[in-house]
Amino acid sequence: MDVEHRHGGNRASIATRLGCQPSDLLDASASLVPWTPRLPRLTRSIIRDYPDRSHNQLRCDLARLHGVPCELLLAGNGAAELFTWAARDAARSGLSLLPSPGFADYSRALGCWDGPWIRHQLPLSWSGDRPQPFPSPAEAEVLWICNPHNPTGQLWSRASLEPLLKRFRLVICDEAFLPLVPAGEQQSLIPLVAETGNLVVIRSLTKLYGIAGLRLGYAVAQPERLQCWARWRDPWPVNGIAMAVGQRLLGSPRRHQRWCRKTQAWAAREGAWMQQQLAVFPGITPMPSAVNYLLIRANRSLLPLREALEQHHRILLRDCRSFEGLGENWLRIGLQSRRNNRRIVSAMRKELSRTPLA
């Protein structure tokens, strides 16, 4: 599979292939909020000076946000960088259990260290968007969790996750999408980190704020673990522009909470609307989701539909073949503004009238 199908958000490369501008494409392949916040005015010093290697102000802002000590936080060049260091610890700890279907970056990170892993098959049929019990995992030394799960949108209850900390030598929990879920913080494992040495929680500001190009994420774990990661990594993994933007976004707790409420209300409203619209298409089943993307299933390949939307309507949906356990009969749709969601539904209706699935 070529690289543009392993991850969403490849507007530039797809635009080149289609002979259009990136701005001509409606990208529903990446699950980002459809707006961006007001960003700080860049000063010459931000560009000229070396960034703070300890990320002190950003760590303090994150610590205040989560109510934990600064020592439990480490900023990173997106969540992907932090998965790489978590995978190094995982490879040293033994066999990893990866959720399937799941985000391919976990296995990519383990591959950097020749870390062994097996799949933990999740159910491909579920109901509702409320917190659910995490399916009982097999035996291994390391458990990787994504909450809410990508790509299914299932939200796991903290009550079902907490006992797993006693079963595994290391638990790595990806909570990149959790801030977009109404009351999602109630299911977060971050409050458990201070008293739990074998837990790593990784988050990203990319999805919540729509700043994928800046690459800004953070890990919450015991200080000894994070100090090791800091010694292994490059000297300046987070650039000054990303740090300044992060401090602007998180510097005011009240402003951050307003943003979260706005984003959560949008995800709930547009998710319900899209569910209703997609459910009437014969041959397509939209799966329940707690977050800002919907997984859709059909009894036959959806690749022709995806390609038609791309070629004829300049709409990008997520090819799910990169998710282990899914195939051509699955697509993922990142929620957009109501106007753009209508555009997606209208284009799908037109293409499905030409080539029905049922």
Located regions from the model:
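Conserved PLP-anchoring active-site segment centered on the Schiff-base-forming lysine
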Residues: 89-111, 116-123
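Active-site phosphate-binding strand-loop segment of PLP-dependent enzymes
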Residues: 122-183, 295
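PLP-dependent enzyme catalytic core of the Aspartate aminotransferase-like
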Residues: 159, 311-312, 322-358
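PLP-dependent aminotransferase class I/II
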Residues: 198-280, 284-287
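Conserved PLP-binding catalytic core of the aspartate aminotransferase-like
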Residues: 267-268, 278-313, 335
